[in-house]
Amino acid sequence: MHIYRTILAALLLCGVAALTSGCPGLAPGSRAYRPLPQWESKFSAQARRDVFPNDVRQKPDGFTNTLVVWTGVITNIEYIADPPPRMVRFYAAHHYFDWIEDISIQRERFFLSPRGEGAFAVQWIAQTADDQKFVDQFAVGDMLIAYGYPTVVRSNYVALNPAQNLRAIKPQWYRTDILDYGRPGEPSKILKTAW
């Protein structure tokens, strides 16, 4: 009888440890952002997350050879056919992102700050059927994760051109009204609970 209680206690202890460890899938928790392994990982590993649109506005030539990653919400999608090649330009409102995936009882995993550093744009070639299939997954209102080189500064946006990689996250997977934060090290606050 004593051995059964010992085994039961050990199993119970292991179960409690697994459920409270924050491991996604077993229980609620958070983890570092996971880029898509096949398409996004190499860019994520190389890109700087500490260069923001206002840095580029203040020093336009200072980051032209620096691969950066910016996040935002797509506000407009524009096709440009002339001059060739056919391009798609995505405009986005920049939002700060803490690079954390929150896995809990709410559906959303990504909590962008309502704040950001203005508009940015990226262009993508859309000449072939495969290019168009890729572009078709993006829509106004999607969260955009864009990797590129900030080489163009306009009065109303900063462009990552050439763009190296893009990822769309549909609106049901992110929110902008839960956490308010800025650049790393700046104060943050909870605006409301996610559920």
Stretches found by the model and what they are:
Residues 1-23:
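Sec-dependent bacterial lipoprotein signal peptides
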Residues 23-195:
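OB-fold and OB-like single-stranded nucleic-acid-recognition modules
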